Amino acid sequence: MEKQILVPSPTDELVNRALEVKSASVSLSQCSNDQRQSALILMTEALSLRSSEILKANSDDVHRAEQEGLNQALLSRLKLTEEKLRISIEGIRQVASLSDPIGIRQLHRELNTNLYLQRVTVPLGVIGVIFESRPDAVMQIASLAIRSGNGAILKGGSEASLTNIEIVKAMKEGLSKSDIQPESICLLKTRQESLGLLGLDGIVDLIIPRGSNELVRFIQDNTRIPVLGHADGICHLYIDSAVNLNQALDIAIDSKCQYPAACNAIETLLLHKDIAASFLKLAIPAFEKLGVTLLGDELSQSFGIITKAEESDWSTEYLDLKLSVKVVSSVDEAMLHIRRYGSRHTDAIATTNKEIARRFLRTVDSSGVYHNCSTRFADGFRYGFGAEVGISTQTLPPRGPVGLDGLVTYRYFLEGDGHIAEDFSNGKKTFSHIDL
């Protein structure tokens, strides 16, 4: 049955703007590796030159958001400091230095004498990205799009509107000095335009939502365009009975507190019953000192946690200094809990038992499964992908942090010399199928 779409059709103006991006993306797909790299460097120079304007616009956005009562987690994502801007610009330079994802020959096969098949990576075309709060996402996404030969239509949250306008203005200035058309990137500014974007099938090839689970599901339900979903980040850390308690505490603190508003911060801590008391003796004062509110099940409350965890807490993404704690009897119970309440984002185990670690890594079906390290490593930049366009929690690829490799597809090229299928049907010719 055909999907029922509930959003309004795109306006003629939006269709025309999208067609401009589509046209520019065709030209961009023909640009050389050097041309795309040079364009990104020019973008970084323009962003650096306009940094004061960008930060001033962000300050205005943050002030307005505070006046409107935006929650602390979203305010944290919205705020763009000098350091965050510098890191974002450096991320673009790293993307420029990455290997070219276009034109990679994945398959080369002789089908018959002088009949050769190739499978070669090519850009997707035009990607549409809808995201909430984070203005640094504009730079990440645009750089990945240009590097991978794709046009990009961007729609940020209204709370970051002034910042996004200044960032895109700077990036377009950089592109205007390159061989790539500035129309390769386009910023949408209204909710009506973002709804219209969902109706641009035939022009837009992929939509990537970055935000709440509600946003992702709304987009999936209201577009015929393929969606690369990035939903809730309900991440877990399980601390096993065989463990270095001090190391496990360091991992837990980093996973929760290093940046609590991130989607790869843990929301639930699972403790083996044999170490729960001794671990919480160390952890409760450490977390209290950092301002973390612990919510525990009945057993963990008996070991000193004051606030009771409700059933809804196990499936809540706090994006804040809150952490649910549950005591389990085994790694199997921990994995069952993760399977029931997790979002298939990133889950970790702290243990010195290699067999337990192996079982956990091979059983937990998340896009990232870690052993003895923080969940905060679930990030394209930290993986060496450069900036990331998002994290996909779906099973089909691309999965996990999506960088350049997730923004290309492939095309089959077949070169012959007058070959016709009839000759193979009647036996005049046979397939050799030799990989070259």
UniProtKB/Swiss-Prot annotation:
**Which Gene Ontology BP annotations are present?**
L-proline biosynthetic process
Q: Does the keyword Ribonucleoprotein apply?
A: no
Query: What is its pathway?
Result: Amino-acid biosynthesis; L-proline biosynthesis; L-glutamate 5-semialdehyde from L-glutamate: step 2/2
What is this protein's name? Answer: Gamma-glutamyl phosphate reductase
Which PANTHER family does the UniProt entry name for this protein?
A: DELTA-1-PYRROLINE-5-CARBOXYLATE SYNTHASE, GLUTAMATE SEMIALDEHYDE DEHYDROGENASE
Which domain of life does the UniProt lineage start with? Answer: Bacteria
Q: What reaction is this protein's catalytic activity? A: L-glutamate 5-semialdehyde + phosphate + NADP(+) = L-glutamyl 5-phosphate + NADPH + H(+)
Q: Where in the cell is it found?
A: Cytoplasm
Keywords noted in UniProt: Amino-acid biosynthesis, Cytoplasm, NADP, Oxidoreductase, Proline biosynthesis
> Recorded GO terms, molecular function?
glutamate-5-semialdehyde dehydrogenase activity; NADP binding
Native organism is Prochlorococcus marinus (strain SARG / CCMP1375 / SS120)
InterPro entries from the entry? Answer: Ald_DH/histidinol_DH (IPR016161), Ald_DH_C (IPR016163), Ald_DH_N (IPR016162), Aldehyde_DH_dom (IPR015590), G-glutamylP_reductase_CS (IPR020593), Glu-5-SA_DH (IPR012134), GPR_dom (IPR000965)
**What is the protein's known function?**
Catalyzes the NADPH-dependent reduction of L-glutamate 5-phosphate into L-glutamate 5-semialdehyde and phosphate. The product spontaneously undergoes cyclization to form 1-pyrroline-5-carboxylate.
Major localisation:
cytoplasm
Q: Is Zinc tagged as a keyword?
A: no
Q: What GO terms fall under cellular component here?
A: cytoplasm
Question: Hey, which family's this protein in?
Answer: Belongs to the gamma-glutamyl phosphate reductase family.
Query: Tell me, what's a Pfam family for it?
Result: Aldedh
